[in-house]
Swiss-Prot record:
It comes from the Viruses. This is Major capsid protein. Residues 44-56 have a biased composition (Basic and acidic residues). Capsid protein self-assembles to form an icosahedral capsid with a T=2 symmetry, 35 nm in diameter, and consisting of 60 capsid proteins asymmetric dimers. The capsid encapsulates the genomic dsRNA and the polymerase and remains intact following cell entry to protect the dsRNA from degradation and to prevent unfavorable antiviral responses in the host cell during all the replication cycle of the virus. Nascent transcripts are transcribed within the structural confines of the virion and are extruded into the cytoplasm. Binds and removes 5' cap structures from cellular mRNA. GO terms for cellular component: T=2 icosahedral viral capsid. Acetylation is necessary for viral assembly. Keywords: Acetylation, Capsid protein, T=2 icosahedral capsid protein, Virion. The modification N-acetylmethionine is found at M1. It is found in: Virion. It comes from Giardia lamblia virus (isolate Wang) (GLV).
Length: 886
């Protein structure tokens, strides 16, 4: 990962001379000295190119786990921070990271009561990225990864204003990568002639034959710096085993434009170039989805050899209202070896024309009738290159055309905007006063899924249903991972379009994102979370689960993973995790918990230090827990056959052999609530984060939660978790029905909101229960913090002998049984175990196991087990941080 967004003049905020597309100014994520200012934030420059050696990135230090009080961040607080590091001297040295830029950003975004919540989140996202990237344990190549932005273009249409376009185009090889997702950047230090094959360079890159169209002019070629070459060499060595193939099996491409990627290129390209291999599978999925979304070109582009003509469904049909003859066109040609991977068993589909509306033109999006009439498509997608905003609207009024203006703004009103089922969601999407349409989400069911039909999956080295051979064993790990059908017992339909969009927000929020980009990401993620109630489908255990599905790793008869060293074999493990959506689509797929592609303990150590999301489970390092809920109670290691208690690194003595990972709505809500609730010092995470939440930051958290509840879930979806309802003497009457029962999946209710409602806030030490005189069965429940102050005082029912709050969900279960909810609820009595009951490690483990064994509905596992954990600050932060990688 890198920071910065292009070319520009150097400044304290911009030591590399990179320019941001954000309002023509500079990206405040750039790490800066102590005297950082924001004077240049809105500075417009002509984006002159600057070259030369990259300045040294200052080492940074951050207050790690162990701090008991987190004061309001101040710019000159370094001494206090270092003093309060806590722990041994070695721990101090290891965690010393100066974060003056982050502190400045924090103060900048925290000024004044009128500061909107979004900048707070943006700041946290930036801080997350920065702290992870400036870790002193990273190598110089990693530290200087930003220099590879020498390849990065600035797209003139991305944000609705012009930029100087000369020398801004992608290199041919860079564009090849972005369009195919199947190669590292090739020999970018060479100048190419039209239609000449690109040969592998002297740095060990594989040989590729990529036909370069004459439309891609040589003056736009760029060269990598020596540092960039080192980065690419490292990246390529990691990509080669799983993504690359011989030259005869790759692509022939004709690429006619440099601005086709628009905002997607802005998001993806930095990650394409970064050397950490754990992003590889997500990147490839996202890039392939990008191809899907953009589609082939028109005009002079011949589609005879395109994969799109046979495999991509007609999600959208777009006709440009302006003559594009004077503009560069784009299209994608592929060799038959690649095309045939997706052709077998897939009925012909219509070609997907381009969805780009050039500046100054308008586009009319014609939505296929099947998308309008199918009940599986509650939302519609319009994707244009004019900017990151999008809009979500219902198709109740059967609207099938939308006019998009030159900046993606809607030029003709949609009649059913006023009938939005999610009008509160739209209120959440207001940003900088704009309300206009760029993208509308399209749902997909099994008739509109690429490339699977009727459960048939395509594996690079396997044919349909795991038989046959396409002769592309090297390609499949890059492509096949995107479309995973785990076995014939589960009919998993995959939409790379949806997966790509879901991945998009993940990448936006972990990089140098501007406010607009973060806004787009939140909208996309929110749309997914609301439209698709999810059920997790989890596979673990080597012999059966990994036998007949597309894995990121080469299969091995020994341990299901092809690794090079015994050390890697003994350390890394992998879990393939999927989410089945409406029995039709998978949003979250292969989540790599380990990447044995570098075959190096040094790489493992670097990742261990650099990845915010990593924490240890026994001997098992976990990372990329991007979509996980807080109810991850136990983790099953397939190679050892053991269950691990993620909190204490201790084995759980249990017969369970499943991975209890809840995925769904919390990917959005929990994460952003967490970002708003934890100070910057807590972002650096080794094993456990114990820093309590400062008063100021907690107020930010509360404001965010209140707004989120009001704008996002205000139609009583999460009122089920209101403390007055849970603990009061009221009856639970259920929630109001809505056209689509999104509220059915309580698992998707944001867990921080549950905590907010239930009063199980951070740091309670104990719960006191007293009978209320004169009222049978009613007790006073008091929660106190570490200082003995009352945190929550409510009336309700409890079991004093267990020092626990008992909740009878029978009424709720009965209500759920009358709905179309996919998750059946049990009428078992739930227990929210309090701090006193789990303080002792033995009792704690017992309580945890009890929760796992007695609570059947996974949707309630989240509530119960979060409540179980939330009273312990360290554990809560520990679990919360698993999603800090989003």
């Amino acid at each position: 990962m890198v920071w910065g967004t292009g070319y520009g003049n150097p400044s304290p905020l911009n030591p590399y001379g990179f320019a941001s597309l954000h309002r023509g100014g500079l990206n405040p994520l750039i790490l800066a000295p102590e005297n950082i200012t924001f004077d240049t934030l809105n500075t417009h420059n002509d984006h002159e190119e600057t070259h030369g050696e990259s300045p040294e990135v200052p080492k940074a230090s951050i207050a790690p786990a162990g701090r008991q009080n987190v004061p309001v961040l101040q710019q000159n607080q370094e001494n206090e921070d270092n003093h309060a590091l806590g722990g041994s001297e070695d721990a101090k040295d290891e965690r010393e990271i100066r974060f003056s830029a982050i502190k400045t950003l924090y103060n900048y975004y925290s000024e004044g009561p009128s500061t909107p919540i979004m900048p707070h989140l943006v700041n946290r996202l930036r801080g997350l990225d920065a702290l992870a990237k400036i870790d002193a344990t990273l190598t110089k190549v990693d530290m200087n990864a930003a220099y590879i932005f020498a390849l990065r273009p600035t797209f003139p249409y991305s944000y609705g204003y012009k930029q100087r376009f000369s020398n801004r185009r992608l290199t041919t090889s860079a564009l090849c990568y972005a369009r195919t997702g199947l190669s590292s950047f090739l020999t970018v230090d060479k100048t190419y002639t039209s239609n000449s094959p690109l040969k592998g360079g002297s740095r060990g890159w594989p040989i590729f034959n990529v036909d370069v169209s004459s439309h891609v002019a040589e003056p736009h070629m760029r060269t990598l710096s020596p540092i960039g070459l080192e980065v690419f060499n490292l990246a390529t060595s990691q990509f080669s085993k799983t993504l690359l193939t011989a030259s005869s099996k790759v692509f022939t491409q004709s690429l006619y434009t440099a601005d086709i990627l628009s905002i997607f290129g802005e998001v993806f390209l930095p990650h394409v170039m970064q050397p950490v291999s754990n992003y590889t599978p997500i990147l490839v999925r996202a890039l392939l989805a990008l191809i899907h979304i953009l589609g082939p070109g028109s005009g002079n582009c011949s589609l005879s050899s395109s994969i799109f003509e046979s495999s991509i469904p007609q999600f959208l049909t777009v006709s440009h209202s302006t003559n594009m003859s004077n503009r560069t066109r784009y299209c994608l040609h592929t060799r038959s070896a690649y095309k045939d991977m997706f052709r077998n068993g897939i009925p012909p589909q219509s070609t997907l024309p381009p969805t780009l509306a050039p500046e100054g033109s308008s586009a009319r999006v014609l939505i296929p009738e099947a998308l309008v009439t199918s009940p599986m498509f509650p939302w519609l997608l319009i994707l244009v290159s004019s900017g990151p905003q999008f809009f979500l609207y219902s198709k109740d009024a059967s609207i099938n055309t939308v006019d998009i203006g030159s900046r993606g703004r809607i030029t003709s009103p949609i009649p059913d905007v006023a009938k939005l089922d999610l009008h509160r969601l739209w209120n959440l999407f207001r940003f900088d006063g704009y309300r206009y349409i760029d993208v509308v989400i399209v749902g997909a069911d099994r008739d509109y899924v690429w490339p699977y039909q009727n459960g048939v999956y395509v594996h690079g080295g396997k044919g349909p249903n795991g038989t046959g051979n396409y002769g592309n064993a090297d390609v499949h790990d890059g492509i096949g991972t995107i479309f995973s059908s785990f076995n014939n017992n589960v009919n998993v339909q995959t939409s790379d379009l949806m997966l790509g969009l879901l991945t998009l927000w993940n990448h936006i929020t972990t990089t140098y994102a501007t406010e607009e980009e973060v806004t787009m990401a939140i909208k996309i993620a929110a749309a997914f979370a609301l439209v698709y109630p999810v059920q997790p489908i989890v596979y673990s255990g080597c012999p059966k689960a990994f036998q007949r599905h597309t894995s990121y790793y080469q299969p091995s008869s020994e341990n299901c993973y092809a690794t090079d060293t015994a050390e890697v074999k003994s350390v890394w493990d992998t879990v393939e995790l999927s989410v089945q959506v409406n029995n039709a689509m998978v949003l979250g797929m292969t989540l790599p918990f380990g990447q044995p592609t570098l075959s190096s303990a040094q790489w493992y150590n670097n990742i261990d230090k650099a990845e915010i999301s990593m924490f240890k489970v026994g001997n098992l390092p976990l990372q990329n827990l991007d979509y996980l809920s807080l109810d991850m109670m136990e983790f099953y290691a397939p190679t050892t056959g053991q269950l691990y208690d993620i909190r204490s690194d201790n084995l759980i003595l249990s017969a369970h052999r499943t991975v209890n990972l809840g995925i769904g709505y919390t990917a959005l809500a929990d994460f952003f609530a967490y970002l708003a609730s934890v100070p910057a010092q807590s972002f650096y995470h080794d094993r456990m984060v114990t820093s309590p939440i400062s008063k100021q930051t907690y107020s930010v958290y509360e404001r965010f939660i209140e707004r989120f509840i009001d704008d996002f879930v205000g139609w009583d979806r999460c009122d089920l978790f209101n403390l007055d309802t849970l603990l009061g003497a009221k009856h639970i009457a259920g929630v109001a029905s809505s056209p689509i029962p999104w509220h059915c999946s309580l698992q998707r209710c944001p867990l921080p909101i549950i905590m907010h409602y239930t009063g199980l806030t951070f740091g309670q030490e104990h719960i006191t229960v007293r009978d209320v005189a004169g009222v049978e069965g009613l007790q006073q429940i008091v929660m106190r913090d570490f200082q003995g102050r009352i945190v929550v005082e409510r009336l309700g029912t409890a079991a004093p002998s267990r020092i626990a709050v008992k909740l009878d969900w029978s009424r709720l279960s009965a209500w759920y049984s009358d709905t179309t909810c996919a998750i059946p609820l049990s009428d078992r009595v739930m227990e929210i175990v309090n701090y006193a009951a789990i303080w002792d490690p033995t009792q704690e483990r017992h309580a945890q196991v009890s929760c796992t064994h007695t609570l059947a509905p996974i949707s309630f596992r989240a509530l119960t087990c979060l409540s179980l954990y939330s009273i312990r600050v360290s554990t809560l932060h520990h679990l919360m941080t698993t999603r800090a990688k989003l």
